[in-house]
C-alpha cells in the first residue's frame, strides 16, 4: 500500500481547520438517593431554586431544596428508571409550558405534553409556570358578568370576569358539574357572539381518576365545547410533583388569553388534592410540618396561584382570567385548614350541601351560606332588577320555615311567604347540561317574583318554566332579544314580558 505524505498532511490540515474550539461545559451532579418521587443530588453547587434539571433518559426534575451538602429534587415522571450514582445535569431553565390558541381542544399533562393521542402541539410561545401576579395598578375592579347558565348562581351569587369564586362541598355534591355547565354555557357566545365576549376555558384535573377525566372530556367533545377548552390532567396515578405543578401550568395557559386582551376561565378541580401532593413532597424533602402536617407555606401555595386571576384595565388590554377553584370538604367541615385558607383568598364561595343534593335540590347550592363578594356589579341591570327581590324573599322563607315547624296556626302573610319560597326554591332547580342564557333566566325569575307561580302546585313549577321558555323562544323572540340587547328591563320590555307571561299562564291553566 502506497502512503503519500502530502495527501496525509492535506487531510490533517483540513481536519484541523474545521476543528471547533468550543468545549461544552455543563454542571453535573450525582444522585445520592432516590425514592417516592424525590432525589437527593450531590454537586450542582450553582443550581437555582425552581430550576429544571435533567436525569438520564430525558426525565426532568425541579430543584426545590438547596442545602449545604446536597440538593432536593422533585422528579416529573417515574423514578423507577433513576438509580443511585446517575449523572444529573443543570438545564439553566425554569419550568415552562407551551401556551396559545394551538392548545385549544387538547388534553395535556402538567408539563404541556399532549396525552390525547392527537399528535404534537405546535405552540409558538412558551411561558414560565410560576410568575408574579399582576400588581395593583394594572388591575380594574370586576364589572362584567361571567354567566354560568345556572339560575341559582347567576341570580344570587353572581360571578364576574376576573373574580375568584370558590366551589366548596363534600364529595358527590356536584362541584365538577358546576364547572362543566359553565364551560358548556359559553358555546352560544363562541358560535355567534363577538370576539371580545368569548371566554376560553381551561380545566385542571388534579388527583382524579382517569376515567372521570375521560368522561369530562367526552362530554365537552359531544357538546362541541372542547374546541374552546384546554384540559390539563395530573391524575391520581401521576407523581405528586405533577399534581403540584398542574394548576400552575393551567394558569399559565389561561394567562396567555388574559394578557392578550381576551377572556379566560379556569377551573381547578381540586385544590385539596394539590395541597395533599405538596404536603407529601414537603415531608419527603424533610421540611418541618405545621397544622394538619401541611408545610408552613401551603397558604402561599394557593394565594400565589389564585392571585393570578385578575381583570386588567384598558391600558393593559382589558383581558381577564376568572378562577373557579374547587375544595372538597369532609363532613361539611369548612373550618378545616385548607378550606379556611382558600375561603380567605377567594372573592366569595358557592357552598354545596349533601342533604340539599339528596332532597333533589340541584345544583345543591346553600343560598344562605354562599356569597359573592363582587355582588351585583357582576350582573346586567335586567338581572339586578329581578334578582334583588328573590334574595330577600328566600332569606325570609328560610327564617320562617324554621319557625313554621313549631306553629300550626300561621297568619295569611306568613303562609303566602312560605308558599312563594317553596316555589322559588323549586324554580332555582336545574337539570345538568342545560344552562340557560341570561335573558331566559331573567324572564323565568321575573315570573317567579311576580306571583305567577303562587297558584301552581310545587310539582308544576318545572313544567311551567319549560312551557314558558318554549313559548318565549318561538312566539316572543323579540322580548328575549330586547333583554339581550338592552341589558335592562325597560318599561316597554316589562309590559311585553308581562303580556307574554300572562298569555302563557292562561293557556297553562
UniProtKB/Swiss-Prot annotation:
Alphabetized GO MF terms: ADP binding; ATP binding; proton-transporting ATP synthase activity, rotational mechanism
UniProt EC number: 7.1.2.2
Coiled coil: none
Protein name: ATP synthase subunit alpha
Function: Produces ATP from ADP in the presence of a proton gradient across the membrane. The alpha chain is a regulatory subunit.
Family of this protein: Belongs to the ATPase alpha/beta chains family.
Keywords: ATP synthesis, ATP-binding, Cell inner membrane, Cell membrane, CF(1), Hydrogen ion transport, Ion transport, Membrane, Nucleotide-binding, Translocase, Transport
Family matches, as NCBIfam families: atpA (TIGR00962), PRK13343.1 (NF009884)
Enzyme class name: translocase
Assembly notes: F-type ATPases have 2 components, CF(1) - the catalytic core - and CF(0) - the membrane proton channel. CF(1) has five subunits: alpha(3), beta(3), gamma(1), delta(1), epsilon(1). CF(0) has three main subunits: a(1), b(2) and c(9-12). The alpha and beta chains form an alternating ring which encloses part of the gamma chain. CF(1) is attached to CF(0) by a central stalk formed by the gamma and epsilon chains, while a peripheral stalk is formed by the delta and b chains.
Site, Required for activity: residue positions: 370
Location(s), subcellular: Cell inner membrane
Residue numbers binding ATP: 169-176
Superkingdom in the source lineage: Bacteria
Xref: InterPro entries: ATP_synth_asu-like_sf (IPR023366), ATP_synth_asu_C (IPR000793), ATP_synth_asu_C_sf (IPR038376), ATP_synth_F1_a_nt-bd_dom (IPR033732), ATP_synth_F1_asu (IPR005294), ATPase_a/bsu_AS (IPR020003), ATPase_F1/V1/A1_a/bsu_N (IPR004100), ATPase_F1/V1/A1_a/bsu_N_sf (IPR036121)
Membrane topology of this protein: Peripheral membrane protein
GO cellular component, as recorded: plasma membrane; proton-transporting ATP synthase complex
Keyword hit for Nucleotide-binding: yes
Catalysed conversion reaction: ATP + H2O + 4 H(+)(in) = ADP + phosphate + 5 H(+)(out)
Gene of this entry: atpA
